Amino acid sequence: SMLKFLIGIGFLEVCSDKLYIYDGPAGQMIQGLGNAHNADVLLEPMVQTPFYTPTRLLIECKDYDKKKVGLDVVRGVLGLREDINHFEIVDTNILQERRKQNRNVINNYSYIRYTYQLAVASTSGFTACAQEFAATHRISLIEFDKLPFWNELMEILGEDKENVDIEEDKLKKIVKQISSHMAVAITNIGQLLFLCCQNGNEEVDFETNEYDISFKNKNESWTLKCGNKEYSFQLPEHIAESWIEYSEYEIKRKKEVIESTEKPVSNMIVYYRRNEKPVIKMLSIDEDKLQEARKKLDETTKKRES
């Protein structure tokens, strides 16, 4: 389902090249420095950022029923990121040629190098330690079961997710309908946000360049408002704290080093489809709105601790 949702929003599926990425008994595999790894969900963004190494997104999916994903899983994902990002295709001829001081230019195996960003999707949440570790190492955490469409989707699929008695075409239609009202944002700390439009069946759009965020309590989704449209999204508590804290620090630094009459802002990138075409937009939030979100987050934390 995760793969289908992201493709519906506009991400591109990565096809196996039969060498660096290949199809194995466990599914799609990706080569690493130490070994090959199973790729649960492997995608490319609809548009790459100019002047940077092209990126791909690898999502590890965990379904532990009621058990939260712990530190061991997220720590393993960090190792996975290091292993696949440090992989290089080199043969003995290249190694021998490197020993010659008057050698010709050495061309390694011809393939496009990618920087892989990692995320973990869970249907049962994450422990506090896992969240803190992920925030430190910029590993995105997705609480799939807290997305607005989750309960509806589970009712359609049935409780036994391993034995789904539903036609593939029908499932694709359902996912396409849901994803047509969704966007994906990437925050300044690398966290993925699934934005679900709350304005009925209206098409996803971000009319202005500014947004505001709010939430009622830790058991409910966050709300992002842009123009006259509202989007709900999930965010693990400790990740939310890290995001707001970093955004406030970012604005503070801009105030110190940039002389401008305009208010400094913190930015994030949003990917979505409009009229069946991919769109990328940068949204900004100012210090006052961040402080309001921080205040609400602190109040919720104090209530829980009291």
Features from the language model and the residues they span:
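Mixed-charge (Asp/Glu-Lys/Arg
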Residues: 1-306
